[in-house]
Amino acid sequence: MWLSLPRSGYGSVATLTSKRVLACLTPLRQFSTSPAVSNANHKNVDNINKSPANDAANNAVEKGDKPTTSPEKLATKAEKSSANSVKAAANALGESNLSNSEQRRLDWIIMKDMLKYIWPKGKTSVKFRVLVAVALLVGAKLLNVQVPFFFKEIIDDMNIEWNSATALGVGITALIFSYGAARFGAVLFGELRNAIFASVAQKAIKEVATNVFRHLLKLDMAFHLSRQTGGITRAIDRGTKGISFVLSSMVFHIIPIALEISLVCGILSYNFGWKYALVTGATMVSYAIFTITTTSWRTKFRRNANRADNEASNVCLDSLINIEAVKSFGNEGYMVDKYQSALTKYEKASIKIATSLAFLNSGQNLIFSSALTAMMYMTCCGVADGSLTVGDLVLVNQLVFQLSVPLNFLGSVYRDLRQSLLDMGSLFSLQKVAGQIQESPNAKPLQLTNGEIRFENVTYGYHPDRPILKNASFVIPGGLKTAIVGPSGSGKSTILKLAFRFYDTQEGRILIDGQDVREVTLASLRSAIGVVPQDTPLFNDSIMNNIRFGRLEADDKEVENAACAAKLDALVRQLPDGWNTNVGERGMMISGGEKQRLAVARVLLKNSPVVFLDEATSALDTNTERQLLANMDQVLGDKTCVAIAHRLRTVADSDKIICLNQGGVEEEGTQAELLLKDGLYKSMWDAQEQVELGEEGIKEAEEKAAKKDV
């Protein structure tokens, strides 16, 4: 089929996220960011691992009128909309460099948006879980603070002369058991908190991921053809992993850390004086400033790693999706080198992440160790002059180390939180990508009578400076078979995409039974049209399920009948697994002709009143093609059928033939009428006849030679 735009299939995006492809991406996956893993590794682990162009036209168009908005203004609006979408998509894939202030602004927006998952409206069970988790958290912190006091009392009570006759008193024994119970209770409350809150985080992950996936499927073809799917899947993968950490951080880290630091500082100040409060306060301020400043500096390394990760994923995905081409041209080595080059970029960025992490950890440890040394010195002086006891020394030591836990969390949580927010920013940016194809607020379901399709002064081009259709006007009569033919680049397949509203016209309008396609709902429009594309999009699933994709509610018998009409039943009977035979990635385990018959079966099962056939039999042999076309003519009956064809013999029986050339209608009529005109169609027909007659002569000679040999 002649095309002016590289084809990717009418549903190929959905096939790109197969398990086989995603499996190759797992070596680059991040470490888990669940609360349990974060707590275990908080010190040393870093997560290295409504189209504006058409609104004016729609408002201006009345029945029989042309848009009053000039093509130049329409193009300008379309470019602005496209530019905004591209910018949002670039943010989503880590391809744009945000300043620190812009990144912080985005972080706050994300955290504000995540609050609705912690405290959702109308979901009492979720709110109850959050309240219980918070109560367990407070209980754990209070028990944690009690542990050093029990230890101090034990030390002071034990600071006596002991001999073999001395026994532990009831008080000391009770303190020892209280010490153990407090430690165990703090840990138990923490684990119960994690278990109870887990469902809240997982529900949020499911809801966000589903919303993003739904939005991606609603975006127009222009977006999907301009983006690399590998980068999108990685953005979703990283973003969903960050949701759990951000939610748990908001509930279990930020507020609790502030609470614990306040408790420890208050105790030190109350029990030991203002000097301890001064050291503690200076430590807090120094630690926070150093951590925030250093982490902000490190963010660019993480962004570079994400960009390299996306690049590697894209190379891997493209290689596996096009594995046949890779092997056919023997370019395995080239693709490996390309993949390794992307991994090298990821390696360099990851090394910078690791080395900057070492600097961060060292600086944090220096600040904390200095504070610990100062406090221990002051306490030892107090013990020496008798104002403090040995138990007080132990208490200060324990409280300072108690302070180290929230301090370390402050550093690691802020660091990991920034990384998670950076990853989530990509995920949420995908939701802000505005599709160029928008449904009108007043859209109504398409009402079909006879299925007439009318193009009125339609101008469209995939690029503004290269229009494919130029002020084209023609009518596809309802209930009849119409063929669209023409040389390469004349806009044949573009007509299908515009009728289906994969794209919107830049000028003019398209009417189906008198209804502008931009004024009807997308669901009703696309359910009314069935398509057999030249490049058949198949899923890595069974033959039965691939055909049933045309109408999901169809039963097995209906699927089998559609396959029989498409001459596919004979193939199925020969297969060991029959209808359950898997067709492989993009249908690579069956032949091109078999794929086309499967696509025909799918559209026959859909049973839509309008059918487009885009070179639907180009991969079939002559006999199978004739049988299939005869079957389809019988099955389609009085449906509106539009056949886009290169081989003119396959559409010679059409009720009407529209011949396109240079973006407009060159001529139209029946086969006989066009041959009498002696125009473009006649010249194309004669050229093909000469080729086919030559091929038939060669075939006859080969058959005669074979009989002679026998």
Swiss-Prot record:
Question: Which ranges are annotated Polar residues under compositional bias?
Answer: 35-52
The answer to whether keyword Endoplasmic reticulum applies is: no
Q: Which residues bind ATP?
A: Y462, G486, P487, S488, G489, S490, G491, K492, S493, T494, I495, L496, K497
Identify the residues that bind glutathione.
R298, T299, K300, F301, R302, N361, S362, G363, Q364, G411
Tell me the Pfam families matching this sequence: ABC_membrane (PF00664), ABC_tran (PF00005)
Q: Where in the cell is it found?
A: Mitochondrion inner membrane
Q: How does it assemble?
A: Homodimer.
- Membrane topology listed for this record: Multi-pass membrane protein
Question: Which keywords are on file for this protein?
Answer: ATP-binding, Membrane, Mitochondrion, Mitochondrion inner membrane, Nucleotide-binding, Transit peptide, Translocase, Transmembrane, Transmembrane helix, Transport
Q: Where is the ABC transporter domain?
A: 453-687
- Functional note: Performs an essential function in the generation of cytoplasmic iron-sulfur proteins by mediating the ATP-dependent export of Fe/S cluster precursors synthesized by NFS1 and other mitochondrial proteins. Hydrolyzes ATP. Binds glutathione and may function by transporting a glutathione-conjugated iron-sulfur compound.
Q: Which family does it belong to?
A: Belongs to the ABC transporter superfamily. ABCB family. Heavy Metal importer (TC 3.A.1.210) subfamily.
Q: Where is the transit peptide?
A: 1-38
Give a Gene Ontology cellular component term annotated to this protein. mitochondrial inner membrane
Segments forming domain ABC transmembrane type-1: 130-419
Q: List the lineage, top down.
A: Eukaryota, Fungi, Dikarya, Ascomycota, Saccharomycotina
InterPro entries for the chain = AAA+_ATPase (IPR003593), ABC1_TM_dom (IPR011527), ABC1_TM_sf (IPR036640), ABC_transporter-like_ATP-bd (IPR003439), ABC_transporter-like_CS (IPR017871), P-loop_NTPase (IPR027417), Type_1_exporter (IPR039421)
Q: Which residues lie on this side of the membrane: Mitochondrial matrix?
A: 39-129, 198-246, 293-358, 415-710
Gene3D superfamilies annotated for this entry? ABC transporter type 1, transmembrane domain (1.20.1560.10), P-loop containing nucleotide triphosphate hydrolases (3.40.50.300)
Chain residue ranges for the region called Disordered: 35-83
Q: What is its main location?
A: mitochondrion
Q: List where this protein forms a coiled coil.
A: none
Q: Which GO terms describe its biological process?
A: intracellular iron ion homeostasis; transmembrane transport
Q: Which residues cross the membrane?
A: 130-151, 174-197, 247-270, 272-292, 359-377, 393-414
Q: What is its EC number?
A: 7.-.-.-
Task: Tell me what this protein is called.
Answer: Iron-sulfur clusters transporter ATM1, mitochondrial
Q: Which organism is it from?
A: Yarrowia lipolytica (strain CLIB 122 / E 150)
